[in-house]
């Protein structure tokens, strides 16, 4: 590889190692390279949790229309959702072109529910995304909690998620679902590790 190409290779390796210092050192050397958008993405993504909103906005403006722009928007939307920064999420979400992140969809559904504009098929939208998530996730779990609290999601759907998670050997996801629908049995939820089928059979008829 050329010297310029080696810079990109080194940056990719530094990104995988989460080496922020190395990324910052190498970024100036990537300027003008055909893959500079990736270099800029790796450098900012590695420190996104600490980045200023102005830095994120500047990146999105500079690389508008690129894959990396929308990829970072996706990352930022997930971060804003985790932080419950609904106003900034709502402002950024309409520009998200890929729209293929289930957790982002669930955060958007949460906002719609909070603002009283959830679609009539909100429960179906939630199920489609939540049930497809194998691992525990904050976005769809939070949306499920919001919809369940508003009586827009039946308990049977939450228990179904718990069963699906157990079948996939995803105990944390199952525990998160149980926490929504039956907090009274949470002290016993450790049984999910030892006898998950027995636990669900005993509690899946719990009121709620």
Show where each model-derived region lies.
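Extracytoplasmic and endomembrane cell-envelope/extracellular-matrix remodeling and assembly machinery
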Residues: 1-64, 69-208
